[in-house]
Regions:
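Short alpha-helical segment of the dimerization/phosphotransfer core of two-component systems
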Residues: 57-68
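Short conserved segments within the C-terminal catalytic ATPase subdomain
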Residues: 106-118
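Conserved polar catalytic motif of the HATPase_c/GHKL fold
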Residues: 137-141, 145
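Short beta-strand/loop element within the Bergerat-fold HATPase_c
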Residues: 154-163
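C-terminal end segment of the histidine kinase catalytic
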Residues: 206-262, 267
Length: 268
């Protein structure tokens, strides 16, 4: 199988897995809505008030399961991504500007108090190679991890030629989490806690041909060393339809992460 067919097969696998998960979740959500409607009309106000916390918890878990399904489908193909993903020339700075803009717009809908700053002193563009879908996964996972620790966090994206730094003012990564990111070593604590966020961060980074190191605190500091910048004339211009689809997908991912965050917090 040639490289193009391999890429197509991987995308089909990932899409098929996501579709299968989502059909199951859609069925669960439909059943939940029927249950909610029945309770709305078949019980008295006192019983309804007693059952509402349970319904809210079920709704939260459905949101989390949908997110986990997307992550699991990514994880199922992550081991193959490094050998088959072909990073394309991109303007990383332009991608980051759009990501931050959408993130701020969506955060305003939930009245979340965190801030995000993009610094790229003296740069108009930051040419490198990467993959827009994988970049979306990388950034949304990073933001999700930060906000899970502190909803009022300050996130900083610092761009210099050949390098991207992600920082926040949170508690920072524990040593075993840093070892998982950079060396793939699972500790007993992390195995018990579960989750796919950290290994997916490493997989996205590796698949794009980027290098990841964990910097010193305070807060979390991740340094991404970027591949050599391609010539600007090597940039592939996407059609307006493709750009719109990319933007919509980016917004969907950000909205999902923030919805999970708000739902988790409301149940605490």
């Amino acid at each position: 199988m040639d490289r193009r067919n391999e890429d197509t097969a991987l995308l089909a696998l990932r899409g098929g897995l996501r579709g299968r998960f989502r059909r199951s979740f859609d069925s669960m959500e439909n059943a939940f809505e029927v249950l909610q409607d029945r309770l709305q009309h078949a019980v008295n106000p006192a019983e309804r008030a007693e059952l509402m916390p349970l319904l809210e918890e079920l709704q939260t878990q459905l949101i989390c399961l949908r997110r986990l399904g997307d992550q699991a489908s990514d994880a199922a193909t992550a081991a193959l991504l490094h050998g088959t993903c072909v990073p394309q020339p991109i303007d990383l700075l332009g991608q980051l500007r759009e990501f931050c803009s959408i993130l701020q717009e969506e955060a305003a809908q939930y009245a979340l108090p965190f801030t995000v700053t993009l610094q790229a002193d003296g740069l108009d563009v930051l040419p490198t190679t990467g993959d827009v879908s994988l970049l979306n996964g990388l950034l949304t996972n990073l933001v999700s991890n930060t906000l899970a620790a502190d909803r009022a966090a300050h996130i900083m994206l610092l761009c210099t030629p050949g390098r991207l730094c992600y920082r926040d003012n949170g508690p920072g990564l524990p040593p075993d989490a840093a070892a998982l990111l950079t060396e793939g070593q699972w500790s007993e604590r992390l195995l018990h806690a579960g989750g796919l966020g950290l290994p997916l961060l490493a997989a996205y980074t590796s698949a794009m041909g980027w290098a990841l190191t964990v910097g010193e605190g305070p807060g979390m500091s991740l340094q991404f060393t970027l591949p050599a910048a391609p010539p600007l004339d090597g940039m592939v211009l996407t059609s307006p339809t493709e750009r719109l689809a990319d933007r919509q997908n980016r917004r969907r991912l950000i909205r999902r992460e923030l919805a999970v965050l708000v739902a988790d917090t409301s149940m605490q």
